[in-house]
Amino acid sequence: MRYQLFCDGASRSNPGDASIGISILLDGKEVHTISKKIGIATNNEAEYQALIDGLNYCVDNSIKEIEVFLDSNLVVEQVNENFKVKAANLKVLNSKVKDLIQEFNFIEINHIY
């Protein structure tokens, strides 16, 4: 069964108070959501943290096949290795995502608008 993971992160200013939102669906039905404040972060850090938290939930719940959707083109392209990760703070987060990706039998990271 292939799940869908929708992730979003936002920062009130850049950096500033940040929050993340995650929704996990199976067959079009929402099975889990996460919404929380993450402290002070940039928009890109928040986007990465949403992805990390969503992937962690999937790993912890033995979800092995997933399609991921984010509205951050930067994060999608960096994770898919089409863009270089230049910022040191994002390199750490990108590395965490790469480690988590290894836990899946199938994973696809997509950009949505």
Regions found by a protein language model. Name each.
Residues A10-N14, I52-Y113:
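RNase H catalytic domain
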